[in-house]
Amino acid sequence: YLFYYFKPKLEFDFKSLFSEISKKEMYRFSLFAFAGSLGSVFAFRIDSLMIPKFISMEANGAFSIGVTLASALAVPATGIFILYAPIISNFIKNNQISELDLKYKEISKLLFFIGALLYSCIFLGIDNLFMLLPTHESLTGSIPVILILGFNVLINMATGFNGEIITYSKYYKFNLIAIGLLIILNVSLNLLFIKVLNYGIEGVAVASLISMIVFNLSKLLFIYKKFKILPFDISYLKLILVFATVLLISYYLPILDNHLLNLIYKTIFCLSLNLMVIYKLKLVFSYNFWVEKMIQKLQF
């Protein structure tokens, strides 16, 4: 159908690409973007190089389990970042800072909402889930790593699209500086926790968490300095308080003898209570919009 109505043809005229910016500026941006991407890959893979070197291959296997499960938390964020990338770029291009501020806060709360729901399930259910598996003895040691790295991902989601704001602005070079800071800090803390304090893979996970907090904090402060916007407001603080309270209540619920029942009832209780309270308080605009839309459809 597409080939029939839209005849494909090759064009080698790239003049339209440089109608608004010069080739030099385009090449400079591409170089910094490539260097930043390469630096990010190295920064987030440095642990898998240092653990076999300073601890053991077995420890690296346990750490990799934690990385894989924690990374699953970030899947929704990846899709949302891709979806909103052109919107962010357009706001910055047209200097619509007030609109950018509103979207920044809205998406940050949405990402934290999704991430906190998933992290709560992992926090409450990971131990019982592993106890149901025949290999639970070999998996138990990775639970602290999973929880720390999961919180690491949650912190990254909670700060919203701060990296995208910097990337699509004239301050895109700062991303490379921030990634350089992340690499130096991560390597230094890994050496401290592994070689000096002998904390093993838990120490590596803590090092990653501290590095990620500093990394995101540096970007938040930079964005505030240049644009005078932050992803946090009063409703965001209420959202954090709701999740923390519900998680605490769920954690101290009576423990059942059956691991499967314990896994199901604690996670369902936590999810249900969070969803109801957050809907009633109208803390996440997108969530309330989706729920009300579903209710309207069911009424018809």
Map each language-model feature to its residues.
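Interhelical loop/hinge segments that connect adjacent transmembrane helices in multipass membrane
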Residues: 1-44, 87, 92-102, 226-240, ...
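Membrane-proximal transmembrane or re-entrant/amphipathic helices at the cytosolic face
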Residues: 10, 249-300
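Interfacial/gating helices of multi-pass transporter permease domains
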Residues: 25-29, 33, 51-71, 99, ...
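Alpha-helical transmembrane segments of polytopic membrane transporters and translocases
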Residues: 31-32, 47-49, 61-81, 109-113, ...
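Interfacial segments at transmembrane-helix termini and the short loops linking adjacent helices
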Residues: 57, 122-154, 198, 202
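Helix-loop junctions and terminal segments of transmembrane helices
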Residues: 66, 70-108, 162-168
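Membrane-interface junctions at transmembrane-helix termini in multi-pass inner-membrane proteins
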Residues: 147-181, 223-225
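Membrane-interface helix-loop junctions in multi-pass transport and translocation proteins
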Residues: 173-176, 180-217, 252-269, 289
